[in-house]
């Protein structure tokens, strides 16, 4: 039974590799963060909103970064849908990109700044 659960977890992790995972519940958020922490993976979070124009501009760039850095976990959180998570990390402007590793916030990028986001993903993914 434990082997099946481990296989299911490994399969789920592999499915998300190279893709942006949209988080729609606190339970899903907790599961994604716990799995990434256990695997000591970099987590890059895009705090976004459906009404945010710059967020829509950054979405394909964020998706490309997820493909280029499949060892990291890329999460997308709608601040209106999951307000408690946005508040927990003091997100006040969109887009805000947060970099976490083993439960600690390592860095952030506030705004639609492609060059800074790309540079910081490369920097933190290498650590």
From Swiss-Prot:
Disulfide bonds: 52-55
Transmembrane segments: none
CDD domains hit by this protein: TRX_family (cd02947)
Catalytic residues (positions): 52 (nucleophile), 55 (nucleophile)
Keywords of this entry: Cytoplasm, Disulfide bond, Electron transport, Redox-active center, Transport
GO cellular component: cytoplasm
Location of the Thioredoxin domain: 2-127
Cellular location(s): Cytoplasm
Site label Deprotonates C-terminal active site Cys, positions: 46
Site positions (Contributes to redox potential value): 53-54
Family: Belongs to the thioredoxin family. Plant H-type subfamily.
Protein function: Participates in various redox reactions through the reversible oxidation of the active center dithiol to a disulfide. The H form is known to activate a number of cytosolic enzymes.
Protein known as: Thioredoxin H-type
Organism: Triticum aestivum
Lineage: Eukaryota, Viridiplantae, Streptophyta, Embryophyta, Tracheophyta
